[in-house]
Amino acid sequence: MLKVLSLRSALQRAASTRQLVYEGYRNPPEAIQLKTVTIADKPSADQVLVQWIAAPINPADLNQIQGVYPVKPALPAVGGNEGFGKVISVGSNVSSIKVGDHVIPDRSGLGTWRELGLHQENDLFPIDNTLSMEYAATFQVNPPTAYRMLKDFIDLKKGDTVAQNGANSAVGKHVIQICRILGIKTVNVVRSRDNLEELVKELKDLGADEVITQEELYSRKKKFPGVKLALNCVGGRSSLFLASLLDHGGCMVTYGGMSKQPVDCPTGPLIFKDISLRGFWMSRWYDIQKSPEKRHEMYQELAGWMKSGEIKKQEIVKNRLEDHAKALDTALSKFDKKQFFVLE
């Protein structure tokens, strides 16, 4: 009888945990609420119990809470698409993940702004346990986006040239660094600003070969022959002139639309240079890429560059869950440093 009671007691054990939840779509600082909930502290057969360690606030997270992102979790939902955590316990059927592993989400909308979470095994992916917090928490989105765009559209060789706008974005900075590692030259377009000289130095320190303003791009005074690949996250006039830099058979890949303007394409290069236009969304790559080997290969190479210091850490600002309104407001208005929730 005592054994039966002990087993029943164990099965009914629960853990209290805090998480950032939204119940409707609106301005993130107003939509997000800090809630304490109770979850089982023992995973079922196919589940994994994760202690989340750190999670960034990304533009996609903000768009999701605003209701304008393609992926919409069922409401109420926990915020956060990216982050990393440590596996506390695993269910009896779990085979690809073990206790002590560091894991990241394997799908969008998982909800990483929480202290503890019970997740299905196939919703998580193990990563290198030795990566520091700044690398591990942002390992899923920006570095792989840069990596895949450089690998999947044009067969780039050492000495080739890549041009990009939004070069000071997180993806743009990873493009610069990966190109430097691979021996590929970069032409980097940024907006004019008061601290332009400081920004140019920062990007050149990362390995940028050329840094020009959008106005310099539009003037066409500078020539950049042999551009094989162009990466566009702005759209509008910027994409028009960026595509004009492409050599014969070149490709412009669009992965964002910061200007909220349609992507423009120059007629002459499209006809006479046979340039192509493609789109890229990292979430879709994860959805259709069912081979764990290809992902392991990418993660291993990126982790190696991070641990060697060839890819530098992002500057971050650490926030507690209870300071969520301020953190979200800052993430909406300032873009120089990545806002993080530290969850341990």
Swiss-Prot record:
The keyword Secreted does not apply. It comes from the Eukaryota. The lineage of its organism: Eukaryota, Metazoa, Ecdysozoa, Nematoda, Chromadorea. Gene3D superfamilies: Medium-chain alcohol dehydrogenases, catalytic domain, NAD(P)-binding Rossmann-like Domain. It is found in: Mitochondrion. GO terms for molecular function: enoyl-[acyl-carrier-protein] reductase (NADPH) activity. Its main location: mitochondrion. Belongs to the zinc-containing alcohol dehydrogenase family. Quinone oxidoreductase subfamily. This is Enoyl-[acyl-carrier-protein] reductase, mitochondrial.
